[in-house]
């Protein structure tokens, strides 16, 4: 609790949110979920797709993969992603998946499942909790519409992955014709420190994540 209060008093928190059409991700999840569960022993959720997209976007927007050292912004070379894990509604810990930017989807999913399991069984070491450069918090598992998370100090941003629902959307074909379709849609909400960068930078970062999630060939990625 003291850490959260300190974070709010230290960083001028700003929230930027963007809606994402996850239909491309959902089609791949639906096609592979049975085989994935049999091979890996855990379910294929949206979170590793988001983590993969975030890691790639951080290469283009490095000031989000940063922390404050005193009054100086320190930009990190590696993406070490802290994953907020609930502990029976008694608090959160954020174990770190190291070098996410050097991993593909399947390995990221394995690593997230591993650190979450160690958290819930109280097997974390101090090393598991150190070195994070950016944080994901997955409130969407509870069906949230949009959450305003608190930055994990001394980092400068945290992304809330909120609930995904089936909704009508306007789709445009190759000839420019519009129609209505039912897609899986959700919100990504970014809380960020206004000392580190401005609103345009934060919005462009979210837009890059959105672009990756909506256009990447996830079928090739999952193999």
Region annotations inferred by a language model:
Residues 1-223:
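C-terminal catalytic/motor cores of large multi-domain enzyme assemblies
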């Amino acid at each position: 609790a003291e850490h959260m209060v300190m974070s709010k008093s230290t960083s001028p928190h700003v929230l930027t949110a963007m809606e994402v059409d996850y239909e491309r991700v959902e089609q791949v999840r639906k096609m592979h979920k049975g085989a994935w569960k049999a091979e890996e022993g855990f379910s294929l959720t949206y979170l590793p797709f988001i983590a993969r997209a975030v890691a790639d976007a951080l290469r283009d927007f490095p000031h989000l993969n940063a922390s404050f050292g005193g009054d100086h912004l320190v930009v990190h070379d590696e993406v070490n992603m802290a994953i907020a894990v609930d502990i029976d509604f008694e608090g959160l810990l954020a174990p770190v998946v190291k070098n996410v930017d050097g991993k593909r989807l399947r390995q990221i999913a394995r690593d997230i499942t591993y650190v979450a399991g160690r958290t819930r069984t109280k097997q974390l070491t101090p090393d598991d909790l150190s070195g994070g450069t950016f944080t994901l918090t997955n409130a969407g598992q509870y069906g949230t519409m949009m959450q305003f998370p608190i930055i994990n100090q001394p980092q400068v941003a945290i992304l809330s992955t909120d609930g995904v629902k089936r909704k009508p959307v306007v789709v445009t074909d190759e000839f420019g014709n519009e129609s209505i379709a039912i897609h899986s849609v959700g919100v990504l909400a970014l809380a960020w420190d206004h000392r580190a960068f401005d609103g345009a930078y934060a919005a462009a970062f979210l837009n890059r994540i959105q672009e990756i999630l909506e256009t990447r060939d996830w079928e090739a990625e999952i193999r």
